[in-house]
Amino acid sequence: MDNINGLPDDLLVKILSFVPTYVAVSTCVLSKRWEFLWMWLPNLEFVSPWDSRPGIVDFINKKLPIHRAPVIERLCIHINSNPHIKPEYIKRWIEIAVSHYVRELQIDYHSKTKITLQLEAESYFIDGKYLQQLISGCPVLEDLSLRFCCNDNLREFTVIIPSLQSLSLFLFGNSNLNRYKIDTPSLKYLKLEDWNDPEHYSWTNMPKLREAYVDVESSNHLKTLIGSITSVKHLTICCLEDYLYGDGFIFNHLEHLKLCMCPFDSSNLLGQLLKGSPNLQVLDIFEMKRNDIVCWNQPSSVLECLLSSLKILNWSAYFGRPQDRDIAVYILKNACHLKTATFLTDKRINDVRRLKMIKELRLSPRASSTCQLVFGEDF
């Protein structure tokens, strides 16, 4: 013990940084000198086995405000179903973390109202009440993730962040959220899962967007969003309502499109997206799992992307229904530069039907003499 006590404080703090936070804290009983050494740690994790202890909330409330490290590199707090926690505690923890120039912040809290918080300098996850305050304290924020769950008291929120490059929004059903505004001119990546139908939403200023994942319930939301994501190179899209989003939207940079065709048939949406994507190279169709018979409205003329750019077609959960076959045959017949077309049949289809579907596709005409058909089973 005398040997280690002879080391400078900076080196002792460095040593403590290699052990879990709860172990580092336990060294405070060794001597007067060790009482506050752990409070210089730049990384703090109040997680298992601490998260289940009754006094963890009081400990954080008492010690975090007097933490001595000028910069907190990482603060991680996981608290599950603790009756002693209050929203104002979380607010205070956020304020303290921001005041210490936190680089990475995670707060996971599950309460009876299903409010979950997780914040990081690259991926922020927070209840909306304190969102604006947090954003104002992070002027160079690049990655933001928001999750608003059922029974939220949140009514509206605004995200205006000039520096933001990645945004993930998870807006789950039965939320009281009815309006939000997004203004992110530097955004490169967007992930949106919105299962609500807010009264008003505004998406503006995303000229640098390169990749987007869009899963929305309302076609109205899709219509509002579509004009702001036309700069993407990679687009994944799923909409519960098969309605067209309007004319005049061209995805000149779109190279890779993934379209979810369930739970409602989205053949009309597929046709419009193909029509507006003249440089598309890869088309993925997936999760088409309903048996509704909906006609494929074949375009009156051959789409530009089929004539000039489409090289790869991947179709997962292929059912071989009439409209499925019509879409597949249309693409094979007109895609002049198609290299591979992969069809993974749904595992629930029996062997006789599967062989029939494969035969239909093998016998269909192909515009590309070098196109290879690949068949398999979707697991």
From Swiss-Prot:
SUPFAM superfamilies linked: F-box domain (SSF81383), RNI-like (SSF52047)
Domain F-box: 1-47
Family annotation (SMART domains): FBD
Source organism, top-level taxon: Eukaryota
Any Pfam family the entry gives: F-box
Residues covered by the FBD domain: 295-345
UniProt-recorded name of the protein: Putative FBD-associated F-box protein At5g38570
